[in-house]
Amino acid sequence: MITFQEKLITAATTNRSLVCVGLDIDTSRIPCSDPLEFCRQIIGATSEFVCSYKPNLAFFEMMGTEGWALLDQVIKMVPPEIPVIGDGKIGDIGSTASAYAKALFEKLDFDAVTINPYMGQDSVEPFIAYPEKGIFILCKTSNQGSEDFQDLITSTGKPLYMVVAEKAQEWNRNNNIGLVVGATYPEELKRIRYSCPDMPILIPGIGVQGGTLNEAVQFGSDKSGRGAIINSSRAILYASAGPDFAESAREAARSLRDQINSVLHENNYDWS
């Protein structure tokens, strides 16, 4: 069976793209009455310019049972060669984590999920145990409040986010772990990439949150010019509030893909 890592690399190479479209489906903002049709058109318009999609579970959960049904349909409408990352930031004790892993990997069939490591290794192990799936561990997140805990200096003399990165390296026996690091903290991203040279890094925070694309690509990419997954949600989904929303999303995704590739080229990385 193809692994998440293999699927991600193939999609990125085929589409020459490090773009991940975040599906943060806010029903108060979508320019059509049917969320399913909105998702269908967004995915159809952008799929040739992305390496992955990332549904934000909270935006589906707030719709209740209809939202869960919608999420299931959205996952299935993504082209099978493009990986889907479930963004739930899950974290709980081992038995509960096992239930989450079964729900997200077996029932909903996500290719990867985001994980909150605050409760330690036993809360992460049930996800690692699926070697064909991927997990992205929250490391240094893009929100301003991340400084409250993630920057605290531990007994090792290192900030907590670096301890998380190093633990992720230790746990990565199945080569299926990645990290979440915000573009809003470029120096921290650079430090984490140096410590974890081969891990994929999911990078939110571009655009609306103020992250700089050049630094995200330059500091987040691995030695081959890959490894960075640049997430964009609102800037693509809501590029237009009119009936041309799908066409506008397509152009926004294409533009971001091309901007990223320009930065890669400037740093002597190419897709060939």
Where are these regions (language model features)?
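Conserved N-terminal beta1-alpha1 strand-loop-helix module at the mouth
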Residues: 1-81, 156, 244-261, 265
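C-terminal helical cap(s) of enzyme catalytic domains, especially alpha/beta-barrels
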Residues: 215-227, 238-271
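Conserved, mostly hydrophobic/aromatic
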Residues: 21, 53, 87, 113, ...
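Acidic (Asp/Glu)-rich catalytic clusters
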Residues: 12-14, 43-49, 73-80, 126-131, ...
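A C-terminal functional module that forms or caps the active site or interfaces directly
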Residues: 183-231, 235-236
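Active-site-adjacent beta->alpha loops and helix N-cap segments on the catalytic face
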Residues: 62-77, 93-97, 117-132, 184-194, ...
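Short, well-ordered coil/turn segments that N-cap beta-strands
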Residues: 15-19, 49-51, 80-82, 111, ...
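Conserved anion-binding
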Residues: 26-27, 92-180, 198
